[in-house]
């Protein structure tokens, strides 16, 4: 029987790129809490002893950006110079400009050529769902995130006190080529930053027994499953001291782990007038409801936009041969049941709220948090009825 391998990865909240994402989204949330219609594109760079805040912000909100950045870094766990990055001791620079008026006139309702709220930029976005996991996410990315959440949990509650904030996980999964179903887990890679005193064998055993095995389905772990734990043998220097971190550099971790295409636009630090974020969330909402409705077991949707224009310039759907109805009919149903204009997306998903900090680590999709309206399946019954199933 033929098989194939597929791999996805996740990173912890202490990974330098994720530190940057979380600072950017904390800034966004602090602004939206006061000014829901603010325009925000908040970028962050973190390096040894340094946090740089830059981008474009137009708002009436009064926010202490430096305080927000420090509090976010401290919450993640970088609160000591021993870790190479200290929330209280690092220098924080603020370099925000206002949004270009040329862009603003295309986004503001009643201005520009299209009097509806136009898209904040051109671009293409994808959404995806499948029936491999309870939250309708691909297996490898779903469980990679769970491994990283487990690492964080054991670090913060003190059960493994030698853990430090920076970590990465990677899963290689074996699929049955005929059924497309997961057969077993081939390889688990987990690298975690640690205190210098911990011995390698103790660390390896603790990671396998206390992080990996409680998370991964035991029936998919076999005698042949390979465990690669801190493969270099040492991971003491990490976080922003080990690597420079930038907002928007973990876009595959943020989405589907490579199981679906990505349009290229990052999420964190962007208010929902930016379709890079809001339309990608809407696409996930559409795809998840199609799968939840039983109209397909796998669904990928692409939409595209032009700056200043409200209606999408294209909508396409691929169900990879699993659809119960034609893809043309699915597109018709999507147009009937989902408003994919920028303002429609914001209203449909209630996006003008300070809800984004939680999304900035462990994936924007596949986590059924109360704030994550794009993970609801409240359109599934209507879609199924309209499809005649």
Curated annotation (Swiss-Prot):
The record's annotation in HAMAP family points to: S_AdoMet_synth1 (MF_00086)
This chain is encoded by the gene named: metK
What residues does ATP bind to? 15, 166-168, 234-235, 243, 249-250, 266, 270
Q: In which pathway does it act?
A: Amino-acid biosynthesis; S-adenosyl-L-methionine biosynthesis; S-adenosyl-L-methionine from L-methionine: step 1/1
Q: Which SUPFAM superfamilies match?
A: S-adenosylmethionine synthetase (SSF55973)
Places the protein is found: Cytoplasm
Which cofactors is this protein said to need?
A: Mg(2+); K(+)
| Segments passing through the bilayer | none
Note the subunit structure.
Answer: Homotetramer; dimer of dimers.
Please report the name of this protein according to its UniProt entry: S-adenosylmethionine synthase
Q: Which organism is it from?
A: Neisseria meningitidis serogroup C (strain 053442)
Annotated GO molecular function terms are: ATP binding; magnesium ion binding; methionine adenosyltransferase activity
- Where along the chain is L-methionine bound? 56, 99, 243, 274
Lineage, top-rank taxon, reads Bacteria
Query: What reaction does this catalyse?
Result: L-methionine + ATP + H2O = S-adenosyl-L-methionine + phosphate + diphosphate
Primary location recorded for the protein, binned into one broad class: cytoplasm
Q: Which GO terms describe its cellular component?
A: cytoplasm
Q: Which InterPro entries match?
A: ADOMET_SYNTHASE_CS, S-AdoMet_synt_C, S-AdoMet_synt_central, S-AdoMet_synt_N, S-AdoMet_synthetase, S-AdoMet_synthetase_sfam
């Amino acid at each position: 029987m033929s098989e194939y391998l597929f791999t996805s990865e996740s990173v912890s909240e202490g990974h330098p790129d994720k530190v940057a994402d979380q600072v950017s989204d904390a800034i966004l949330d602090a602004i939206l809490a006061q000014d829901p219609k603010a325009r925000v594109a908040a970028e962050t760079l973190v390096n040894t002893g340094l946090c740089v805040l830059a981008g474009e912000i137009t708002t009436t909100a009064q926010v202490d950006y430096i305080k927000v950045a420090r509090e976010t870094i401290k919450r993640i766990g970088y609160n000591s110079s021993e870790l190479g990055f200290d929330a209280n001791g690092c220098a924080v620079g603020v370099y925000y400009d206002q949004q270009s008026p040329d862009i603003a006139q295309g986004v503001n309702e009643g201005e520009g050529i299209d009097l509806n709220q136009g898209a904040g930029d051109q671009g293409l976005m994808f959404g995806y769902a499948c029936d491999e996991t309870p939250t309708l996410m691909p297996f490898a990315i779903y469980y990679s995130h769970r491994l990283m959440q487990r690492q964080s949990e054991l670090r913060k509650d003190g059960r493994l006190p030698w853990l430090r904030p920076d970590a990465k996980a990677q899963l290689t999964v074996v699929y049955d080529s005929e059924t497309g179903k997961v057969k077993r887990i081939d390889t688990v890679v987990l690298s975690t930053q640690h205190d210098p005193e911990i011995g390698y064998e103790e660390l390896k055993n603790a990671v396998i027994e206390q992080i990996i095995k409680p998370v991964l389905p035991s029936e998919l772990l076999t005698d042949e499953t390979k465990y690669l734990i801190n493969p270099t043998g040492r991971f003491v220097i990490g976080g922003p001291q080990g690597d420079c971190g930038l907002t928007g550099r973990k876009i595959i971790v943020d989405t589907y782990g490579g199981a679906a295409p990505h349009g290229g636009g990052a999420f964190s630090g962007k208010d929902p007038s930016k379709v890079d974020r809001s339309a990608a969330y809407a696409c996930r909402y559409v795809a998840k409801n199609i799968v939840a409705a039983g109209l397909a077991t796998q669904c990928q949707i692409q939409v595209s936009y032009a700056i200043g224009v409200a209606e999408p310039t294209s909508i396409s759907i691929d169900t990879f041969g699993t659809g119960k109805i034609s893809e043309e009919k699915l597109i018709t149903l999507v147009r009937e049941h989902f408003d994919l204009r920028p303002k429609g997306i914001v209203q449909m998903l209630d996006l003008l709220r300070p809800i984004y900090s939680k999304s900035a680590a462990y994936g924007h999709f596949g986590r059924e948090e109360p704030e994550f309206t794009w993970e609801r399946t409240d359109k599934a019954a209507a879609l199924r009825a309209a499809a005649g199933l």
